[in-house]
């Protein structure tokens, strides 16, 4: 699943070519994503100039003077440029075509769990956006905040930091990596972790996410950035996808467990 670094990489890849362009048409070949793409989307957006892009958690906002296109990449989505008139493949569901017509913005989603929604309201007040927690790379995400939110919570720390109401964008890959870097077992209860260790975890989440963004995200299967290229952070992964392999610190075999139907990999020697 594309997580925050992949979404940020996508935004940075498409923004320079999008801003200032006017939409000529929207070709919707498959409207059945996580939520149905409404037939009105094309008429609402045609002729509109894109003013800027922004991100909230894993949602990309493509803004015009009239409203905002909200895009979520779901489990397997990608948003990238192709030369105009490039024939679509089976999983290429939507094309955004521009007046100058040299390139199109294409949305591809094999599993169709993503979303493309239009709103004329402030997108921060949209039902999908307004309840989200702070951005992990912002000053609002800090040790004081996390300690207060964790107090008394009897849920595993990995599950806790993956809750988008606590902090946005920390998905399975980067939760595994940040907890390893912080030396915290993923099954330790959030409410039992000291403020000092939570401060270390906050620092590690920020470091891991920033490094992943710098590498263009992590490509495990489907993801490509806005330039159509894969992310290269996979080569930096210390625990995710490395069950039973040697720990990069102590060389002991890494252990895999299941948490909330997701794979969790950690070192029983280096994480406590």
From Swiss-Prot:
One of its GO terms (biological process) is base-excision repair. The active site is at residues 2-3, 58, 262. DNA binds at residues 91, 111, 153. Its cofactor is Zn(2+). It catalyses: Hydrolysis of DNA containing ring-opened 7-methylguanine residues, releasing 2,6-diamino-4-hydroxy-5-(N-methyl)formamidopyrimidine; 2'-deoxyribonucleotide-(2'-deoxyribose 5'-phosphate)-2'-deoxyribonucleotide-DNA = a 3'-end 2'-deoxyribonucleotide-(2,3-dehydro-2,3-deoxyribose 5'-phosphate)-DNA + a 5'-end 5'-phospho-2'-deoxyribonucleoside-DNA + H(+). Keywords: DNA damage, DNA repair, DNA-binding, Glycosidase, Hydrolase, Lyase, Metal-binding, Multifunctional enzyme, Zinc, Zinc-finger. Pfam families: Fapy_DNA_glyco, H2TH, zf-FPG_IleRS. A zinc finger (FPG-type) spans 238-272. This is Formamidopyrimidine-DNA glycosylase. Involved in base excision repair of DNA damaged by oxidation or by mutagenic agents. Acts as a DNA glycosylase that recognizes and removes damaged bases. Has a preference for oxidized purines, such as 7,8-dihydro-8-oxoguanine (8-oxoG). Has AP (apurinic/apyrimidinic) lyase activity and introduces nicks in the DNA strand. Cleaves the DNA backbone by beta-delta elimination to generate a single-strand break at the site of the removed base with both 3'- and 5'-phosphates. The gene is mutM. Gene3D superfamilies: 1.10.8.50, MutM-like, N-terminal. SUPFAM superfamilies: Glucocorticoid receptor-like (DNA-binding domain), N-terminal domain of MutM-like DNA repair proteins, S13-like H2TH domain. It comes from Marinomonas sp. (strain MWYL1). Monomer. Belongs to the FPG family. One of its GO terms (molecular function) is damaged DNA binding. Binds 1 zinc ion per subunit. Its EC number is 3.2.2.23, 4.2.99.18. The keyword Lyase applies.
């Amino acid at each position: 699943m594309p997580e925050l670094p992949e979404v940020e990489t996508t935004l940075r890849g498409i923004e320079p070519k999008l801003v200032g362009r006017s939409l000529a048409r929207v070709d919707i070949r498959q409207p059945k994503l996580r939520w149905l793409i409404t037939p009105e989307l094309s008429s609402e957006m045609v002729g509109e100039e894109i003013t800027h892009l922004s991100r909230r958690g894993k949602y990309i906002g493509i803004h015009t003077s009239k409203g905002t296109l909200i895009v979520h990449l779901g489990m397997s989505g990608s948003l990238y440029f192709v030369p105009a008139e490039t024939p679509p493949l089976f999983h290429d569901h939507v094309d955004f075509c521009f007046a100058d017509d040299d390139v199109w913005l294409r949305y591809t989603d094999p599993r169709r769990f993503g979303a493309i929604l239009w709103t004329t309201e402030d997108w921060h007040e949209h039902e999908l956006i307004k309840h989200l927690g702070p951005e992990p790379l912002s000053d609002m995400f800090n040790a004081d905040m996390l300690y207060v939110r964790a107090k008394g919570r009897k849920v595993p720390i990995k599950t806790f930091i993956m809750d988008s109401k606590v902090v946005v964008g920390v998905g399975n890959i980067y939760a595994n990596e940040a907890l390893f870097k912080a030396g915290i077992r993923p099954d330790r209860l959030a409410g039992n972790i000291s403020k000092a260790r939570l401060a270390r975890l906050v620092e590690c989440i920020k470091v891991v996410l920033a490094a992943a963004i710098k590498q263009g995200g992590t490509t495990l299967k489907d993801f490509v950035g806005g330039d159509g290229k894969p992310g290269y952070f996979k080569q930096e992964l210390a625990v995710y996808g490395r069950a039973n392999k040697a720990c990069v610190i102590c060389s002991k075999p890494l252990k895999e467990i299941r948490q909330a139907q997701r794979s969790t990999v950690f070192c029983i020697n280096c994480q406590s």
